[in-house]
Each structure stands twice: as structure tokens, then as C-alpha cells.
């Protein structure tokens, strides 16, 4: 479990330390998609073709896998705390992967009221919940004192659209999906192969008809003139 608190706004580390892995996991949950097109394009992406399945199997740079040749279950979960209402809600996705699967066939997005359970989605034997096991947890949370949010969040969703509607409307408080994705993408370092200047233009300033960089430069110049007077 990794903790990100209110004032954490920088996620950094050495190359290969796993920054992209964490950000990709967050993006899967926020976008409701397991498509490789949503994953972070890292500097070494030509050598390491990322996919959610390769992540789940624990792909290593030498081509080996931590979970090769075995059936397993796994979850990616975000625990969200509303500082206004003091309500915690969890959103995520659960997977069941077969040892011979060449793509992800069985998975479901879910949400539930309250914090991550004390067992951290593990059975008494230390095995991650199956989708059926997760369904039981969600059903229990319906009658729990934790269920005090704005709407019905204790659900396993039949579609990506149903999941995202609950996440953006009920849990996040009517966030516009397109803007959410644009801003979140702008917060993630993708490629810097064209130099720092082009990277800043592409990913730190939203595209518009106006020359945003020139406008900001003019404003900074005017500010310096005022300061020097």
C-alpha cells in the first residue's frame, strides 16, 4: 500500500525505480480502461512494451515473470478520502488471470464505501480475493456504518461506462470526464525525446489556438519591468 496525502504533488525517482508502474495502476482505475494506449510511454518503452497483463504477471526487464505459469487473482484499488464530508470510498478493478491467458478475459471494476478492509483484500490464506469474494465484501458494505456517502457506490459494474459515471458523478462530485483525463495526463511525464522545451509545451500547457507560452513570457516580462521600477 502506498500513501499519498493532501500536499503530495511530486512523484519522483531514479530511472527504472517503478514510477511509471504506479502511475499506470492509478490511470487504469481513474480511466476505467485496461487498454495499453492509456499506459505511460516511458523513455525505454521501445524495449519494454507495457500492458496491464504484463504488469499483473510481474514482467521483468530480462523477459521473466514473477507469476509465470500460474492462475492468480489481483486488484488495483484507490482509497479516496473526502476532506469535506470526512467520507472514505474505494474504487478499483479486480482481475482473475489464467496461466494460459494471452489477454485479460475476466475482470470487473468496482467501488465500495469505507476504507480498504483490514485484510487488504486477502483471504485467511493470504490469497487475493476472487471476484466472487469481492462481491461479498461489497454486499457487506451496503449495510455497514461506512455507507454514508452521496449515492450508491457499493457495486460491481457491468460496464466501463457505468463505473465511470459513478466515479466522476457520485464519488468525485460531477467532474467533467474529458477535462479530468486531460489534466491527469498533463501531470504525468511522458516522453522527453524532443527536448525539455518541447516536452513542456506538449504536456504542461493545454493545446489551444493561442500561443500560451508567448503569452506567459510576455506576462513575466511585464512583471519584471514592474518589479524593477
Predicted regions and their residues:
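Extreme N-terminal "head/tail" segments of very large remodeling/mechanoenzyme assemblies
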Residues: 1-138
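Extended, Lys/Glu-rich alpha-helical coiled-coil stalks
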Residues: 127-229
Amino acid at each position: 500500500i502506498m500513501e499519498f496525502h493532501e500536499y503530495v504533488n511530486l512523484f519522483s525517482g531514479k530511472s527504472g525505480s517503478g514510477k511509471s508502474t504506479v502511475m499506470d495502476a492509478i490511470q487504469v482505475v481513474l480511466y476505467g480502461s485496461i487498454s495499453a494506449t492509456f499506459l505511460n510511454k516511458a523513455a525505454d518503452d521501445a524495449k519494454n512494451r507495457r500492458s496491464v497483463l504484463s504488469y499483473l504477471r510481474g514482467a521483468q526487464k530480462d523477459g521473466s515473470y514473477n507469476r509465470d505459469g500460474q492462475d492468480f487473482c489481483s486488484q488495483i484499488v484507490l482509497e479516496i478520502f473526502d476532506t469535506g464530508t470526512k467520507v472514505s470510498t474505494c474504487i478499483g478493478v479486480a482481475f482473475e488471470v489464467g496461466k494460459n491467458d494471452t489477454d485479460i478475459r475476466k475482470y470487473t471494476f468496482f467501488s465500495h464505501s469505507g476504507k480498504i478492509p483490514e485484510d487488504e483484500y486477502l483471504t485467511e490464506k493470504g490469497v487475493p480475493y476472487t471476484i466472487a469474494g469481492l462481491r461479498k465484501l461489497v454486499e457487506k458494505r451496503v449495510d455497514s456504518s461506512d455507507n454514508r456517502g452521496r449515492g450508491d457506490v457499493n457495486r460491481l459494474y457491468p460496464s466501463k461506462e457505468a463505473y465511470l459515471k459513478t466515479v466522476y458523478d457520485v464519488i468525485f462530485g460531477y467532474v467533467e470526464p474529458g477535462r479530468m483525463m486531460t489534466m491527469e495526463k498533463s501531470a504525468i511525464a511522458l516522453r522527453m525525446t524532443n527536448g525539455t522545451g518541447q516536452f513542456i509545451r506538449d504536456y504542461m500547457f493545454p493545446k489551444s489556438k493561442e500561443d500560451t507560452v508567448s503569452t506567459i513570457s510576455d506576462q513575466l516580462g511585464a512583471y519584471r519591468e514592474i518589479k524593477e521600477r
